[in-house]
Structures are given as structure tokens and as C-alpha cells.
Amino acid sequence: MSNSNISNGFASPSEDGARAFRAIMIAMARPGKILDLDFLVPPEPLSPAAGTVLLTLCDPDTPVKLLSTVSNKEVKDWLAFQTGAVTTEAHLASFVIGSWSEFNPINQFKKGNSKYPDRSATLIVECDDLKDSGMALRGPGIETVSYLSLPEIEAFQKNNAQFPLGVDFIFCAGSKIAALPRSTKGTKD
């Protein structure tokens, strides 16, 4: 493990971690709201936002799946050193990170069960860009309608149709994040 992997965590772990956690929770509570998470520079190819999400939400009890676009020795070593999180298979992971094309079919990931719907995966999707245009979002945390540029509509509609089961999404583009909880309905307006 190189020194750059060790030094690329939060500059001020308790303060940066608290601010990052708050931003992630705001994104989940306000679907479609684009926020900035510029707290660190993780190893490539992870974006600053995705690295911040992983450092904020993962610990030694968190199973993570790194899909092929983000899985390399530097990322694995960095994640292990910074969080202690273990890598696992996709169907066992609480957090899965990669590019959109790697997530299909979405039903390969944990979606919870009727007794424990919270035992589902959060998919961290690395994107080229995030814009407040595109798919119309409605549901909890949205006063009337919110818009978010998403890679497609059908997968999100199928995911929402399973509610309270399903997966949650955090989209990352550079230092920007936006979230789409499974409770959010999406339509093409």
C-alpha cells in the first residue's frame, strides 16, 4: 500500500465526516437535489464524491462490492485502510459502486424482505455529469416535482414498484452527489 492511499482520507475526520454525513442525508431526504461533496481525493478511478460516500458510510461491518470500472488494487487497499470495509459478492453487498452499465439487472442486488426491507443495497453510481433536468421525480421529500438527469427511466420505475423493497441510489459525478431512494417515483415529463 502506498503512502498516497493512506493520506487520501478526510483531512479532519470527525468534522469532515460529520459534514459529509449531513450532506448525504440531505441528498437522501431531498431526492434530486444536487449537493457538493468535495472532501477528499480518493485513488482513481473513484470520484471525490464516491470516495467521500464510502468513507462516510462504510466501516468494518460493511460489505462492499467494487464493480469492474472502479475495482483495482489501489482502490481496494485504500478502502480497506480507511474504513476496514470488506469486499464481497454483489448479492451480499450493502454498498455497490460502479458505472450504470454494470448495474443491470438491478434485481441481482439485495432488496430487503417483507420483514426487513431496510436490509437492501445502496448502489453508488459513478456518472459523467449530474443535472437538474430529465426525469421528473415525485414522492417523499419533494414538495411538487424535482428533476434529475438519470441514465434511464424504466429501471427506476421497476425499483419503485417494489416499494418498500428495492434498492436506493446515490449518483456521483466528480464532487457532486444526488440520491434517489426507492420511495421516489420517476416519470418522463
Walk through the language-model features, giving the residues of each.
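Internal, well-folded beta-alpha domain core
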Residues: 61-62, 73-189
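N-terminal, charge-rich interaction modules
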Residues: 1-63, 67-70, 81, 175, ...
